[in-house]
C-alpha cells in the first residue's frame, strides 16, 4: 500500500477512523500513506486507549524466531487457547502476516527491546509454546507503541495528511446512499456542539467495554461505544458471551475499587508469570497446580476461573489471592524485576508494596471482549460503508478465549487489512459483505462475513446449531445523510427526537417464584454506572449460571427505560451516551450468555452439564443483528 497505488485513479477516498488505539492509529497512517483523506476521531486524547495500558507485548514469529518456534506453532497455540471456537482462516492470517506488520510498525517509529546480542528480546507468556513476545520499555509496550504512532500521526497532521479531532465522542453513524442503508459519516460531540463528518467509509476502532464490570484493566473510555454504534445501524454482532478476565489485576483499596471510572488500573502482566511468578492463596498454598497441569502458565480463562473457584471454595468469593514475584528475584538475582518490569516496579512501589520481598494482592478483572461486530478478513461488516478492526470487531480470530499478546497483533493485522479493503486492494468489493456459512476448523459451519452484496436486514441471519428464543428489537435513530458536498464538517443532522431509541426486548425465561421480576429489580436498585458494573460482575462475570443470568437480564430491562429517555440522542453529556451504550452492551452480552448453556472458553456456567474443555471443531457461534431472529442454519 503506497501512494502510487492510487496514481491516476479517482479523487482520494475519505476514511473516517473512530478510535486511537493501535488499530485506529495504524490504519489511519496506512490509509493516509496510500493517498486517502483521513479524519481521525478520538473520544479523549490520542493516548486514551486500551493500547496505552498494554504491558506484555505483541506476539509474532519473526524471520529469525526463537529456537524451535514456527508460525505453525503460533497458530496451534492460538487455536488451543481459543477452545476450538476460532475461525482458523483468520488465525492463519494473523500468525502468518504478523512479521509484516511488526516491520510496518518500524516504519512509523516503533522500536522494540533488544537483548544483549542486539536481537529482539523475546518473552514467554502463558499458553505460548515458545518465546515470541516482543516488548518495549520492559513492561510498557503499549505506551511505547502508542507514543511512536501518535508522534507519526501528529507529523502526518502537520503535513496535511491526517485531520485529528480530539475529544470527539461519536454518538451515531449517518446513513445515506441510494437505499439509505450505507454508512456515509459519523456524528459526534465536540466542544459542546453536535457536529458531523462525511466519509466514503467509517472504520470503527473503538476498543472494548471493560467498564461493564466493577474490576477492570481498561481505562474509563472503554464503554462499548463502537459496538453500540454498529448495532444501531443494523450490523451483526457475535460471540458476546466471551469476555476475558485477566487473572492478575492488583487489588486496590476498597475506596479506590468503588470509584466508577477505575481510570488507573494496574494489570500485572502475563509476562511476570512467564518469568516464574506463582499464585498463592491466603494460607500460602500454591493452588494453580491443583486446577491445571500448566499451573500459572495455563490459558487466561483457566487461571481466572481457577482463582474464582478457589476463592469460592475458601468461602471468600469476593476476595483476592497473591502473586509471588519474589521467587523471580531469588532465581534471577537482585535488580532483575526493576530492569525487566520497570513500570510495574514503580507502580507497585507507589501502592506501598515492594514486590521484590512482598506478595501482591491480585484478582481477576475484565480485560478483553472476544466478541464484537462481525467482519470478514478485510474488516467489512454487514453494513455497507462500515468497517471495524481491533477489539470492537469479531473476525473469530480470538475464539472463546484470547491468547496472551494477540490483541495488539490483531489490531495491527486486521487494521491494515481493513484499509486494504477500503482501498479495494483485497480482490473483492470494498462494500459490506453478507453473513454466510463457511467452513472452519473441523468443517463445521460458522457465521462469517464474506461475499459482495449488501445484507438485507429484513431477512433472518443464521448461525450453526441453535436459535435464540426471541427476536431482538431495537429501533434505530433514523439519520439523514450528511450532504454530499464533501465539506469536512457539518452540523450533525441526527434528529434524536424524531425516533426515540428503545431498549433491546426479548422474552426471558420465568424466574423461580412469584414476583421474581420485581424482587430482582429491587435488589438491583436504581440505575447508576456503579450499580450496572456491580450487577454484571455478580451475575455475568467469571462464574455464571442460568438463574444469575436471567436475574441480570430482568434488571437490565427494567433499567433500560430509565437510561434511554427522550433526550439521549440530543444530549451534550458524554456520560449519558456512554451509559446508554454500556446498558445496550450489557443486555447483548447477557442474552448471549443465556443462550449458550454449556461452558466454553471464557464463558463458564456452573450449571453446565460438562466442564469447559478444548474441543476439536469450531463450535456454534451466536450471531445477532437488530430486528433479526436467529434460526437453525
Could you tell me what each predicted segment is?
Residues 106-194, 198, 205, 249-258:
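Conserved redox-cofactor binding core of oxidoreductases
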Residues 60-94:
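Glycine-rich active-site loop/strand segments that organize a redox cofactor
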Residues 2-13, 30, 34, 45-46, ...:
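Glycine- and aromatic-enriched mobile tails/lids
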Residues 201-256, 266, 405-421:
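Glycine-rich loop(s) and the adjacent beta-strand/alpha-helix scaffold that form part
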Residues 86-99, 133-151, 165, 216-224, ...:
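Short beta-strand to alpha-helix junction loop
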Residues 46, 229, 235-353, 421-427:
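An anion/pyrophosphate-binding glycine-rich loop and adjacent beta-alpha core
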Residues 172-191, 196, 353-397:
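FAD-site-proximal beta/loop scaffold in flavoenzymes
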Residues 14-40:
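N-terminal Rossmann-like FAD-binding beta1-loop-alpha1 element of flavoenzymes
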Amino acid at each position: 500500500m503506497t501512494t502510487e497505488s492510487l496514481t491516476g485513479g479517482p479523487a482520494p477516498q475519505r476514511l473516517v477512523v473512530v478510535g486511537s488505539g493501535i488499530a485506529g492509529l495504524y490504519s489511519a497512517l496506512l490509509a493516509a500513506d496510500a493517498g486517502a483523506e483521513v479524519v481521525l476521531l478520538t473520544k479523549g486524547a490520542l493516548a486514551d486507549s486500551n493500547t496505552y495500558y498494554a504491558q506484555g507485548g505483541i506476539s509474532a514469529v519473526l524471520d529469525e524466531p526463537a529456537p524451535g518456534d514456527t508460525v505453525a506453532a503460533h497458530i496451534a497455540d492460538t487455536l488451543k487457547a481459543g477452545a476450538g471456537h476460532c475461525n482458523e482462516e483468520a488465525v492463519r492470517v494473523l500468525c502468518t502476516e504478523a512479521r509484516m506488520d511488526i516491520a510496518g510498525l518500524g516504519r512509523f517509529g516503533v522500536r522494540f527491546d533488544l537483548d544483549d546480542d542486539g536481537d529482539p528480546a523475546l518473552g514467554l507468556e502463558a499458553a505460548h509454546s515458545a518465546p515470541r513476545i516482543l516488548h518495549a520499555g520492559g513492561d510498557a509496550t503499549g505506551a511505547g507503541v502508542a507514543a511512536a504512532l501518535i508522534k507519526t500521526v501528529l507529523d502526518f497532521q502537520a503535513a496535511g495528511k491526517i485531520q485529528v479531532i480530539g475529544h470527539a465522542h461519536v454518538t451515531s453513524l449517518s446513513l445515506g446512499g441510494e437505499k439509505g442503508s450505507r454508512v456515509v459519516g459519523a456524528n459526534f460531540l465536540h466542544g459542546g456542539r453536535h457536529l458531523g463528518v462525511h466519509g466514503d467509509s467509517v472504520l470503527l476502532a473503538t476498543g472494548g467495554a471493560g467498564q461493564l464490570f466493577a474490576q477492570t484493566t481498561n481505562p474509563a473510555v472503554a464503554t462499548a461505544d463502537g459496538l453500540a454504534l454498529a448495532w444501531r445501524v443494523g450490523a451483526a454482532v457475535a460471540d458476546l458471551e466471551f469476555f476475558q478476565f485477566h487473572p492478575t489485576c492488583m487489588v486496590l483499596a476498597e475506596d479506590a475499587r468503588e470509584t466508577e471510572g477505575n481510570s488507573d488500573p494496574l494489570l500485572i502482566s502475563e509476562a511476570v508469570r512467564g518469568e516464574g511468578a506463582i499464585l498463592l492463596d491466603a494460607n500460602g498454598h500454591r493452588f494453580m497446580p491443583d486446577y491445571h497441569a500448566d499451573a500459572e502458565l495455563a490459558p487466561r480463562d483457566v487461571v481466572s476461573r481457577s482463582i474464582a473457584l478457589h476463592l469460592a471454595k475458601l468461602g471468600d468469593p469476593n476476595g483476592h489471592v497473591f502473586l509471588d514475584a519474589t521467587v523471580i528475584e531469588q532465581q534471577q538475582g537482585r535488580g532483575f524485576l526493576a530492569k525487566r518490569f520497570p513500570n510495574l516496579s514503580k507502580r507497585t512501589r507507589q501502592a506501598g508494596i515492594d514486590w521484590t520481598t512482598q506478595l501482591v494482592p491480585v484478582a481477576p478483572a475484565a480485560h478483553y471482549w472476544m466478541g464484537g461486530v462481525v467482519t470478514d478478513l478485510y474488516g467489512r461488516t454487514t453494513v455497507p460503508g462500515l468497517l471495524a478492526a481491533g477489539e470492537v470487531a469479531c473476525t473469530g480470530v480470538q475464539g472463546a478465549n484470547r491468547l496472551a499478546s494477540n490483541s495488539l497483533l490483531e489490531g495491527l493485522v486486521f487494521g491494515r487489512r481493513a484499509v486494504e479493503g477500503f482501498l479495494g486492494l483485497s480482490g473483492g468489493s470494498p462494500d459490506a459483505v453478507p453473513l454466510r456459512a463457511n467452513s472452519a476448523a473441523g468443517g463445521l459451519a460458522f457465521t462469517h462475513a464474506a461475499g459482495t452484496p449488501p445484507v438485507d436486514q429484513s431477512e433472518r441471519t443464521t448461525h450453526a446449531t441453535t436459535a435464540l428464543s426471541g427476536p431482538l428489537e431495537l429501533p434505530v435513530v433514523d439519520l439523514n445523510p450528511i450532504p454530499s458536498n464533501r465539506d469536512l464538517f457539518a452540523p450533525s443532522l441526527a434528529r434524536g427526537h424524531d425516533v426515540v431509541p428503545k431498549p433491546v426486548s426479548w422474552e426471558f425465561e420465568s424466574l423461580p417464584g412469584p414476583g421474581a421480576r420485581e424482587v430482582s429489580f429491587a435488589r438491583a436498585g436504581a440505575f447508576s454506572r456503579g450499580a450496572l458494573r456491580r450487577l454484571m460482575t455478580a451475575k455475568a462475570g467469571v462464574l455464571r449460571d442460568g438463574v444469575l443470568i436471567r436475574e441480570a437480564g430482568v434488571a437490565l430491562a427494567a433499567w433500560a427505560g430509565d437510561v434511554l429517555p427522550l433526550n439521549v440522542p440530543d444530549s451534550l453529556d458524554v456520560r449519558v451516551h456512554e451509559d446508554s451504550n454500556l446498558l445496550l452492551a450489557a443486555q447483548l452480552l447477557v442474552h448471549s450468555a443465556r443462550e449458550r448453556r454449556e461452558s466454553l472458553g471464557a464463558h463458564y456456567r456452573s450449571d453446565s452439564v460438562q466442564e469447559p474443555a478444548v474441543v476439536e471443531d469450531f463450535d456454534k457461534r451466536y450471531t445477532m443483528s437488530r430486528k433479526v431472529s436467529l434460526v437453525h442454519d
